[in-house]
Structures are given as C-alpha cells and as structure tokens.
From Swiss-Prot:
Major role in the synthesis of nucleoside triphosphates other than ATP. The ATP gamma phosphate is transferred to the NDP beta phosphate via a ping-pong mechanism, using a phosphorylated active-site intermediate. HAMAP family: NDP_kinase (MF_00451). Belongs to the NDK family. Homotetramer. It is an enzyme of class 2 (transferase). GO terms for cellular component: cytoplasm. This is Nucleoside diphosphate kinase. It catalyses: a 2'-deoxyribonucleoside 5'-diphosphate + ATP = a 2'-deoxyribonucleoside 5'-triphosphate + ADP; a ribonucleoside 5'-diphosphate + ATP = a ribonucleoside 5'-triphosphate + ADP. PANTHER family: NUCLEOSIDE DIPHOSPHATE KINASE. ATP binds at K11, F59, R87, T93, R104, N114.
Amino acid sequence: MSAERTLILVKPDGVSRGLVGEVVGRLERKGLTLVALELRTLERSVAETHYGEHASKPFFGELVDFIVSGPLVALVAEGPRAVEASRGLIGATDPVKAAPGSLRGDYALEIGQNLVHGSDSPESAKREIDLFFPGLS
C-alpha cells in the first residue's frame, strides 16, 4: 500500500500543557513516520487561510484568535492511510464526544481548545501541507 501524508497541528493548548511528546508518541506507535516538524507561532494570515472554510461561521474569529495565541507544533506524518489512522487517534472534534483512548477523549474538555488538528481528507492534507510546509510535496 502506498504511503499517504497528513498534517497534524498540536495546538497552543497542547503545547502549553506539555502534550507534544504524547501526540508524537501515539502517531509513531501507530506506525506513522514523521517527515517534518516545526514549532512556530502562526501568522494571522496563515491561520485565516487554514480555517478559510469556516470564515462565514460565528466562531471563526475565536478559532483564529486561539490558534495564533501561542506556539503550536506543525508536523507531517506519513504512512498507509495516514489521514484515517491519525483521525482515529485524535478523536471527535467535540472532546466530550471523543472516545476514551483518543487524544481528545483523554486530554481535552472544550471544543474550542481541543488539543490537536488533523487533516480530514487526503485532499485537505495536500492543501494544508502546502500551506504549512511549502516545498515539502
């Protein structure tokens, strides 16, 4: 089976709580390989582009404000069915509905500060990787 890539963001709440190692460890134990990793604070324009699909929604401003509020870790993981595999590890967007054992189920409480982002499709992954790591693809 061919390798697929996905973008994972450990959001500012995950970084400030010291959970980067937990996220990376779970991805690696699942069998995914890290091909890029960077600690950075996002520029607002990058955040607005990343969350562009939500621009007309009432929570857009809060979402952007949060993601630029502190450093995050952006990483690219690779492996068979990487998008699907990482989404399973991450859990449902609403942490209260996320399964125990998932990152959000174990470590997050609020939908707005839900620890981690993962690409939701191979097409989104390509777009997001191009935004965060231009030249990697």
